[in-house]
From Swiss-Prot:
KW Endoplasmic reticulum (keyword) present: yes
Gene of this entry: CYP1A1
Listed Pfam families: p450
Species per Swiss-Prot/TrEMBL record: Balaenoptera acutorostrata
Family to which this protein belongs: Belongs to the cytochrome P450 family.
Stated name of the protein: Cytochrome P450 1A1
Amino acid sequence: MFSVFGLSIPISATELLLASATFCLVFWVVRAWQPRVPKGLKSPPGPWSWPLIGHVLTLGKSPHLALSRLSQRYGDVLQIRIGCTPVLVLSGLDTIRQALVRQGDDFKGRPDLYSFTLVADGQSMTFNPDSGPVWAARRRLAQNALKSFSIASDPASSSSCYLEEHVSKESEYLIGKFQELMAGSGRFDPYRYVVVSVANVICAMCFGRRYDHESQVLLSVVGLSNEFGAVAASGNPADFIPILRYLPNTALDDFKDLNRRFYIFMQKMLKEHYKTFEKGRIRDITDSLIEHCQGKRLDENANIQLSDEKIVNVVMDLFGAGFDTVTTAISWSLMYLVTSPSVQKKIQEELDTVIGSARQPRLSDRPRLPYLEAFILETFRHSSFLPFTIPHSTTRDTSLNGFYIPKGRCVFVNQWQINHDQKLWDDPSAFWPERFLTADGTINKALSEKVILFGLGKRKCIGETIARWEVFLFLAILLQQVEFRVTPGVKVDMTPVYGLTMKHAHCEHFQAHMRS
């Protein structure tokens, strides 16, 4: 028995020695597990965490808000744990630009998360951990294919490019559909129709054809995308707590099945293209990729080929880049229009002055419609419906703001925090498109570049430019002809629901009135 501070403790010398040895072993393991920090650098700060689960409870149902609050206490570079996995969290515009742009090679990796291996058979450019020359070459090819079939023009069309042609047709369909619904029930939920039209645009770009809106092919694509968003929104704890992969997990099983079905669908579309492919007559993005596969190198300085089985993965990435983001952006835009009728009126006055009613808006009108552009920027900023980028990881040992970051560290980039940072924005909680306009009514370019929604640097969304064009065209054409309202007395719920893309509650009380 030992006496400590006058208290008798019933413990033998052997037990005390064993307890001391256990403590020393645990202490040594913990110290060995932590990376050695080079002299002159520090480890990122962060809050105390629970054993095994880490900061899961701290993150709660709104991780973007929880991590924004933590950044106010610990700074722009902080570290948390999800399960037993350390995660670096970046906030602040300057810090994120430093990491993703100036030190882009250090932060261009993707973490080797289990859920990422389930997307596109583990070969997705977007989710794959590979960041070497093969990945870079495929990314360039995908960007070029997407761009060429967006800005290229159809000789038989009066539109300036394929994207303009497809969006114009879908916008006209939506206007007609909204009037049909108004003649019936007098109200509707625009999301269910917008999502199908946006899917039809990307189908036309990727597969060379638009579908009837009741087509089972088109509706199955929409259904798969909606399922992906719903399942991804719940997150995959198995990414950070590996033992969960081997326990009953309905959400994970659903995610596996969803990706399998989407992969099978894309393979079917690719097989149909191979049957009808004619060299020299390129109809769409898939044909363009097949042509490269059959004889062109992706990189003239390296022997890098695009195999047949990889084409389906590239098409899946492009489809994802051009679908959910655009749908969500338009959906949020419509919500802001009905909750800010004075803003909608200003946009329509600008359209009337610049374009009139004799013709449809075109992409070339974009520089002459600054208020509409300011509205889109404010929608992106205020909603921040992509609160985080897809997680990054470090490709080598590096440092940031004086903190040591080891190779392979998972990195969360908090875009929501930037878009609501009081250091950057006056009254960030207010929806105010005018903040982006200069005294002479033009777009404040420096301020517009502070809105971060599509990521930055080498992993920036490949569909960003096309997404911005598409959102602009849909809104310009719709607002030229239609005034949106909600049923009198109905309060619109703008509360965002956290997910891969944050959605608002569906509103079934929209009304669309034709403008005179």
